[in-house]
């Protein structure tokens, strides 16, 4: 397991500059064949946790919410699941309001391009276009990853996290499933 925080920690990340090939090389991603890109630490567990048990994932979080607890939980998840991870430092909130990443999209795209083209990924996984339950960062992550994935690849190995359902509609959803 490896993650990066500009120090030999379990998770790589916490940065003010762009992701570099040299930095990705330092993570020794040879055993990682799958890429998971999420908006926040804990999204990898909530939306993609079962997949992490398969190992071989490089998990990238776009923001940590400047939250030490979430960083530590991410590090522990990556360590315990035997995967590798990177936390970037794009803003979660600005002046108490959720950031729309307006001034950061070009930088996010540059980082996504570096990561997506770093090596051949057998699978790329991210938030679904609806942002699971409509979270703006999940929606934007999905949109940016999808855009850059198809700009760089001509294949269909991009996958989205499943649909989120509110508790009150679960019986209706369950009744629509095949037995």
Predicted region positions:
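Short, small-residue-biased leader/transition segments that mark boundaries at the very start
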Residues: 1-4
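Active-site rim/loop-helix segments in enzyme catalytic domains that contact anionic ligands
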Residues: 7-118, 147
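Short His-Asn-centered micro-motif
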Residues: 37-41, 127, 136
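Active-site environment of divalent metal-dependent phosphoester hydrolases
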Residues: 43-47, 66-68, 129-134, 166-169
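A structural signal for short, well-ordered beta-strand segments and their strand-loop junctions
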Residues: 87, 123-127, 157-162
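Proline-aspartate-enriched helix->loop->beta-strand connector
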Residues: 113-116, 120-130, 138
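Catalytic domains of cell-wall/extracellular-matrix polysaccharide-remodeling enzymes
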Residues: 129, 133-159
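The feature marks non-catalytic terminal segments
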Residues: 152-179
């Amino acid at each position: 397991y490896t993650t990066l925080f500009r120090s030999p920690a379990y998770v790589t990340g916490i940065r003010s500059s762009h992701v570099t090939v040299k930095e990705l090389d330092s993570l020794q991603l040879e055993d990682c064949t799958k890429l998971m890109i999420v908006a926040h630490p804990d999204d990898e567990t909530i939306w993609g946790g079962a997949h992490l048990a398969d190992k071989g994932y490089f998990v990238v979080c776009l923001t940590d919410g400047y939250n030490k607890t979430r960083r530590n939980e991410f590090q522990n998840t990556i360590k315990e699941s035997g995967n590798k991870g990177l936390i970037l430092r794009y803003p979660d909130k600005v002046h108490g309001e959720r950031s729309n990443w307006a001034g950061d999209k070009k930088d996010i795209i540059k980082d996504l391009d570096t990561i997506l083209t770093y090596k051949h990924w057998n699978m790329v996984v991210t938030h679904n276009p609806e942002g699971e339950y409509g979270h703006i960062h999940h929606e934007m992550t999905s949109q940016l990853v999808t855009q850059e994935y198809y700009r760089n690849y001509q294949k269909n190995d991009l996958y989205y996290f499943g649909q989120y359902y509110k508790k009150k509609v679960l019986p209706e959803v369950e009744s629509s499933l095949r037995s």
